[in-house]
A protein has these predicted regions:
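Extracytoplasmic/peripheral linker and loop segments enriched in polar/acidic and small residues
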Residues: 363-369, 423-432, 457-525, 548
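Long beta-strand-rich cores associated with HINT superfamily self-processing modules
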Residues: 521-548
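N-terminal lobe/hinge region of extracytoplasmic solute-binding protein
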Residues: 48-98, 215-216
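Gly/Pro-rich hinge or "lid" segments in bacterial periplasmic/extracellular proteins
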Residues: 81-85, 159, 170, 176-245, ...
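Append "and occasionally in soluble cytosolic enzymes with long acidic Gly/Pro-rich linkers
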Residues: 311-413, 500
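Ligand-site clamp/hinge motif
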Residues: 237-282
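Aromatic- and charge-enriched surface segment that lines or borders ligand/interaction sites
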Residues: 92-140, 173, 267, 309-311
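Ligand/substrate-recognition segments at binding pockets and active sites
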Residues: 227, 373, 379-450, 491, ...
């Protein structure tokens, strides 16, 4: 199985192009015509990237599957190109003031929504202020807008205080309270997509649940939506670059069962699947349609620090130290993940242009690849539970896809070795993320794939008021370090603050890193070409072309 080095990829660019494995094994029998057969003469690419999404409202989504769908149907001010560089999106150009506090974006002339109505700079004012609306409760609000003037007043309820303005229909101006070295990356982030005020005010939260009301501005727009079956996105004729979109649409098959996806792929019904059955990995490694590539992100465990005994950091540390990360990633997960020694892993870039993890902890990993059983037992004893005595049976919650159940069963065995009994609760995907976000768990499977390469994107997750802080980790010292990283103009001071924050997080076991992500998928290139994959875990279909 060929894999690519994220270190090399991220040093040059933040995007990777697909590389497969050489083999002469039999491939699926699908053809371009069979893939598009259900839609007549239209060139429809049939794919699977996940089950029914929890949401595809750009302001509310925090999942990769939903993000992949939003990516096809919306376009931000800026985008990431194939080389991982920031490129024009709806904005054809932009300027930054000398002090780094004012960004002026010039929109393309004649932009339209998918329903044909004009899209103007005022739509961005509305959309960005909506992200701050406490009634919307956007999980990314603090991450993407806390550096904008008036954010504190906006998040408290007066969204008009967020200092963004539209001097005219094609000019959008953002005023920052402090310089942000990665703000251009935020302007390319899906949460800050423009959304249409008319459709949201007319339909409320339901606007993002049906083809009739899901108005967008990207290369594709939703034309059919059958919940738990499929979402059909067709080429958006009102997209500014529609003439360069080669396919007529994308059919997202909403399949949660990886075996069902695999069968549909092998039968030729689907040309691309993200969810590959883990039991098939060994037999797929030599196939030239099986791809494995690194992405920036970490598979980790959230521990609910608001519940006993997890409010005791020694309990959390014991659970973390008892994990053999090398065995888990390389044996049980068959090398499709990499063992994590840190929370912030490969691909995240430090202020000096080197990889952040190489400068952490004196250049050494915080965790050894193997379990530290004696250290785990000592931590458990320090917590007042020698050999697990007096500790109640704990519950680990996860959804049942990919390796999640495998990880859960391993944790049962690993933690049993230090005297900790564990029950596993399997939760369907539709219920899992809301449950986790609401804190209705003890221990839960979690993970984060980068939205941009700055390490703050990972470390902000554990800031006490962050909407994605599922374990409710709360350490004022940690918060101060994150706040310093947001406001300082000194790159060295910023780097030191972020490194100290990670050190504190690891010492507190505020969460438990398990493995670094790779993406693995099946893609039939006898049917489709032009799909490209980014280091942020997204597949881009706007350049796709059906063969034949």
């Amino acid at each position: 199985m060929k894999t690519r080095s994220l270190t090399l990829l991220m040093a040059a660019a933040m995007t990777v192009s697909a590389v497969g494995c050489s083999s002469n094994d039999t491939k699926p029998t699908s053809t371009a015509s069979s893939t598009a057969a259900a839609t007549g003469d239209k060139k429809i690419l049939s794919v699977q990237i996940g089950p029914n999404p929890e949401t595809i409202d750009p302001a509310l989504n925090s999942a990769v599957d939903g993000g992949n769908m939003i990516l096809q149907s919306f376009e931000c001010l800026l985008t990431n190109d194939k080389e991982g560089k920031i490129a024009p999106g709806t904005a054809e150009s932009w300027e930054v003031s000398e002090d780094g506090l004012t960004y002026t974006f010039k929109l393309r002339e004649g932009l339209k929504w998918s329903d044909g109505k004009p899209l103007t700079a005022n739509d961005f004012v509305y959309s960005w202020q909506r992200v701050c609306d406490p009634a919307v409760a956007a999980p990314y609000a603090e991450t993407v807008l806390s550096m904008v003037e008036g954010y504190d007043e906006a998040i408290a309820g007066d969204i008009t205080k967020l200092n963004v303005e539209a001097p005219d229909d094609t000019t959008f101006v953002v005023h920052l309270s402090n310089a942000c070295p990665y703000f251009e990356s935020l302007a390319a982030f899906a949460t800050l997509s423009p959304v249409q005020k008319d459709t949201i005010e007319a339909n409320g939260d339901a606007w993002a649940t049906s083809a009739e009301t899901y108005v967008s501005n990207g290369p594709f727009h939703v034309t059919e939506w059958v919940p738990n079956s499929y979402i059909l996105m067709e080429k958006n004729p009102n997209y500014w670059d529609a003439e360069n979109i080669k396919i007529d649409g994308i059919k997202f098959n909403l399949i949660e069962d990886a075996n069902a996806s695999y069968n549909a792929y092998n039968s030729g019904e689907i040309a691309f699947i993200k969810d590959v059955p883990t039991e098939e990995i060994a037999s797929l490694k030599d196939r030239d349609d099986f791809f494995v590539e690194p992405i920036i992100g970490t598979y980790y465990i959230s521990v609910n620090t608001e519940k006993e005994p997890f409010n005791n950091k020694d309990v959390r540390r014991a659970l973390s130290l008892a994990i053999d990360r090398d065995y888990l990633a390389n044996t049980l997960m068959q090398g499709t993940y990499s063992p994590s020694g840190n929370f912030v892993g490969p691909g995240w870039m430090d202020t000096d242009g080197t990889e952040f993890y190489k400068n952490s902890n004196g250049g050494e990993s915080f965790y050894t690849p193997e379990a530290d059983i004696e250290g785990a037992k000592a931590a458990l004893e320090a917590a007042g539970y020698p050999n697990g005595e007096g500790l109640p049976t704990l519950t680990y919650s996860t959804n049942d896809s990919g390796y999640h159940k495998t990880v859960a069963e391993y944790l049962q065995q690993a933690w049993k070795e230090i005297g900790v009994n564990l029950d596993v609760e399997i939760v369907e995907w539709a219920s899992f993320t809301p449950m986790r976000r609401n804190g209705d768990f003890e221990i839960a499977r979690n993970g984060w794939v980068g939205d941009y390469s700055d390490p703050s994107n990972m470390l902000e997750l554990l800031y006490s008021t962050n909407g994605n802080n599922d374990g409710k980790y709360n350490n004022p010292e940690y918060d101060k370090l994150i706040e310093l990283s947001r406001t300082t103009l000194d790159p060295k001071e910023r780097s030191e603050a972020l490194h100290k924050a990670e050190e504190l997080l690891i010492d507190d076991a505020g969460c438990i890193p398990v493995a670094y992500y790779n993406d693995f998928w099946l893609e039939n290139r006898d049917v489709v070409t032009g799909i490209w994959h980014s280091a942020y875990g997204y597949w881009h279909f706007e350049d796709a072309e059906l063969v034949g």
